[in-house]
Amino acid sequence: MRSDIKSYTLSGMGCSASALAIDMAQNLLKIHRNSHAIVLSTEILSNGFYSGNDRSKLLLNCLFRTGSAAILLSNTKEAKEYSKYKLLRTLRTQRAFEDKAYHSAFREEDSEGKLGFTLKRDLLQVAGETLKSNITVLGSSMLPLSEKVWHGVSIFWKKIY
C-alpha cells in the first residue's frame, strides 16, 4: 500500500462500527484537504453463530446475517459538483451506562459450554429508548428556533394539565 494511504480497522462491534467509521472518516477529512475516504463495512455472522439449544441465544442466528456496505466520502471541489448526497452531521448515542441496557445483549457460554450471544427481553425497550434519545438530540440540532419554542410550550402545557 502506498505511504499516503491510511488504513484503520474497527472490529468486533457489528453494524455499530459503521457509524463509528463514518464519523471517523468525516473527522479525518476535516484535517486532510482534497482527500477521499472509503468506508467498507461488513457483518459476518459466522463468528457469532450459535449451535446450542438455548432459545435466548438462537434468536441471533435468525436476526442477523452476512452483509456489507461501502461509502466514498470526499472533500474535493469535484465532489461538491458531482456528488448526489452531502453528509451534514453524524450522531451517535449509547446507553451502556444503564445496567438494563448493558445487560440486554451480551456474549456468554450456555450450560453445555457453547459460546453464544444472549438477547434479553429488555432489548426492544432499550432500543426504543436509545432511538428516542437519538431523535431528541438530532431534533434539537436540526429544528428551527420556532419549532423548539413550540415544542417547549407543548411540554409545559402537558405538565400543567
Question: What is each model feature region?
Answer:
Residues 1-35, 47-48:
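Conserved catalytic cysteine-centered active-site region
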Residues 42-161:
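Hydrophobic pocket-lining "lid/loop/helix" segments that shape and contact the acyl-thioester
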Residues 37-39:
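Short glycine-aspartate micro-motif
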